[in-house]
């Protein structure tokens, strides 16, 4: 069997109707959403299946929805392929919480409430319309970091997601981000695309949210991971609960080092990356980071059935 990693997507991968066909074949999907709904106090499965999209896209609802979707797919995987165990896990931003639940670190219901709170705190930290995020395509990291420094002028703007070589996301105060995006274009970026988000994640504007999240996180029991989980902030697999807590708090205002995460997996002998969650965002990034890695996304019956042959 090939050595494989499981990776879990973050916000942007959600879609109304996700997991519908898996739910028809595997009752554990709706059972998982029922547990999430009990923790939240509203019907999450109904929101995910019926929408509307503008409700699902509110960050405090997106985050529990994606966490529940990834955990549901993972539980289906464990039912169908108990013999197929990943050697390592990681998640992109919110996906780190999915990875920690699937690695046995955080109780599922605790995590659902935690990511709902994370979404609310993130939204409260920056009034809607005052922050922005742009994807910068086709410019090297150093040039982007320099553009952000030049654009600051006393405001927050920084590189926040190192997604793949030539794809970096910047975030911060709206005007500063727009200045930085223009400077990136001047420096030779192919494109600077505004992202449809209500919150500028992973920049210094999220520090107040992180401080409040820390208080709640302190009261949650964390277990030792059954599978190593590489974190976003240091690309390290922490085993002590204090370190895992600190990494989750820092994650809110620190860059997601995804390129390095995938490179580390490849260096450690991983041959296949399996994305557990809706969409194919991480699958697409993998091929741009390490071309020789195989990548697949498992989010419906067809992809679930096909994965065994890929890992053989």
Predicted regions and their residues:
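Glycine-rich phosphate/pyrophosphate-binding beta-alpha loops
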Residues: 62-64, 200, 255
